């Protein structure tokens, strides 16, 4: 096993929150073991104490640089280590990305998330994505980037460009991290998350379930997320999308009730975070998605494609939200746009 320089340099320790409970793995596993309806009821109560249960935050995700990633994540079709017939593509042009963002905004998305398939950006890449962030931010949308591991100063550059959120998932239980990924360590993820927080960026951090993990390991993932200090503002919970050619293509299907339990436990342990129903939703029946919303999910990826895998189309999501009497959360602008609106009393049309 290759040990990263970060792992040798320091050991990451979980510390109790000043304002939040420290979650032991065994306590989180005990939540998973509650009777199903009792668990959903408890999660729904906590959700209503912290959010309007009818509001759903809509994000659109775009891969701005696809394929050829040097990491060997067992779940990912973009890895150069796997034969998934996914070609390597160059970075998209700024104008093309902005046009995609305009379309996403016109369809109701309040946040535009951009991902790039690399281990981490080079300085010239940070310059490029900074220009993209500024352009998208100019549309009046929140921005989120998932650009891999960051070097010193990069998070500050992204913050200065206008980035709101940085996505950096913990993927799975720290105890089984190297069963899923061999080209990096759990401590590498923690290191970048620290850089992101120190730069003043909001954190989007979640993981993937359905990768042949045990319930105890799902509890370990949730505990590791809940014990981040402070807790992530956004927590994407992904259900594995099995892609031919990846090591997890034949993973055993996760029972739908276990996924809903994961959403509920995430809501209970992270009461003020947005819990996003993320990858895998295209294979979820409407009733299952409704249970997830009841259990505390209040964010979705909106649009017919995620990075490389399918997602329900906007019309289907719009119909489902109407059936469930849900509506999109509106992004409140900041900076110059907010000042104009406040001074004039007129809502700016982007």
Swiss-Prot record:
Record's protein name: Biotin synthase
Pathway(s) it belongs to: Cofactor biosynthesis; biotin biosynthesis; biotin from 7,8-diaminononanoate: step 2/2
Binding locations of [4Fe-4S] cluster: 69, 73, 76
Chemical reaction(s) catalysed: (4R,5S)-dethiobiotin + (sulfur carrier)-SH + 2 reduced [2Fe-2S]-[ferredoxin] + 2 S-adenosyl-L-methionine = (sulfur carrier)-H + biotin + 2 5'-deoxyadenosine + 2 L-methionine + 2 oxidized [2Fe-2S]-[ferredoxin]
Function: Catalyzes the conversion of dethiobiotin (DTB) to biotin by the insertion of a sulfur atom into dethiobiotin via a radical-based mechanism.
Enzyme nomenclature, EC number: 2.8.1.6
Co-factor binding comment: Binds 1 [4Fe-4S] cluster. The cluster is coordinated with 3 cysteines and an exchangeable S-adenosyl-L-methionine. Binds 1 [2Fe-2S] cluster. The cluster is coordinated with 3 cysteines and 1 arginine.
Family: Belongs to the radical SAM superfamily. Biotin synthase family.
Keyword annotations of the record: 2Fe-2S, 4Fe-4S, Biotin biosynthesis, Iron, Iron-sulfur, Metal-binding, S-adenosyl-L-methionine, Transferase
GO biological process: biotin biosynthetic process
């Amino acid at each position: 096993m290759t040990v990263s320089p970060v792992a040798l340099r320091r050991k990451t320790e979980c510390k109790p929150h000043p304002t939040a409970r420290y979650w032991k793995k065994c306590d989180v596993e005990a939540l998973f073991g509650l009777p199903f309806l009792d668990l959903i009821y408890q999660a729904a109560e906590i959700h209503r104490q912290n959010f309007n249960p009818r509001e759903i935050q809509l994000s659109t995700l775009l891969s701005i640089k696809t394929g050829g990633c040097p990491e060997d994540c067992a779940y990912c079709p973009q890895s150069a280590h796997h034969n998934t017939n996914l070609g390597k593509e160059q970075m998209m042009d700024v104008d093309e990305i902005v046009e995609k963002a305009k379309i996403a905004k016109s369809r109701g998305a309040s946040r535009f998330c951009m991902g790039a398939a690399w281990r981490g950006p080079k300085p010239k890449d940070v310059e490029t994505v900074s220009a993209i962030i500024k352009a998208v931010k100019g549309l009046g949308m929140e921005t989120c980037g998932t650009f891999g591991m960051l070097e010193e100063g990069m998070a500050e550059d992204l913050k200065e460009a206008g980035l709101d959120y940085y996505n950096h998932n913990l993927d799975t239980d720290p105890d089984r991290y190297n069963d899923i990924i061999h080209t990096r360590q759990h401590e590498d993820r923690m290191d970048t998350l620290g850089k992101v927080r120190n730069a003043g960026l909001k954190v989007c951090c979640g993981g993937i379930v359905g990768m042949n993990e045990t319930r105890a390991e799902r509890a370990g993932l949730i505990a590791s997320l809940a014990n981040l200090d402070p807790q992530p503002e956004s927590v994407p919970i992904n259900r594995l999308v099995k892609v031919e050619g990846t090591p997890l293509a034949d993973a055993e299907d996760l029972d739908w009730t276990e996924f809903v339990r994961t959403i509920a436990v995430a809501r209970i342990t992270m009461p003020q975070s947005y819990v996003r129903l993320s990858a895998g939703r295209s294979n979820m029946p409407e009733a299952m998605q409704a249970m997830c919303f009841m259990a505390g999910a209040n964010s979705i990826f909106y649009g017919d494609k995620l990075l490389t895998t399918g997602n329900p189309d906007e019309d289907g999501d719009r119909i489902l939200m109407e059936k469930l009497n849900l509506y999109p959360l509106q992004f409140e602008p900041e900076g110059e746009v907010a000042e104009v609106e406040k001074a004039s009393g007129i809502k700016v049309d982007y």
